[in-house]
């Protein structure tokens, strides 16, 4: 995922924009993806060379936030054995069995796929819970790399999540501590 895929280049003037709680339509001037001005009337000299987009009174809202996602689990239903019961506990068991078979590159590819879907639905901030009970930290390493790579287009917060429990087995608490130190 490259910033260029999701960044707006050049200047655009969005006209006849409806903002929440306002009756009067406004215009929004955007230059290289940055909001420069929101006003009822933007002087013509400020919009020379801008591509104009008429929104015909459509509502423009801030981007959405997804406060609870597990990006290391996205698109994993086809991995390993099927969750026959459909229960959370069997799902956790199936994940435990398959998570050790992935590389950081494979995990990153799935994380990027999940982020793309989120962004296409208007999400620009995600808090993801990443399993830190994998002693190789594959998911966490992948998520940390992705967070750095998308920082200009997405706010990605990472929570160190002990999927199999902090105290459920010997050393679980140490894995969580190590995951927290990693970032």
Question: Which ranges hold each PLM region?
Answer:
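N-terminal metal-binding scaffold of metallo-dependent hydrolase/deaminase domains
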Residues: 1-46
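Single, functionally critical "micro-switch" positions that shape active/binding sites
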Residues: 65-69, 97, 121
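Active-site loop-helix segments enriched in His/Asp/Glu that coordinate
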Residues: 99-181
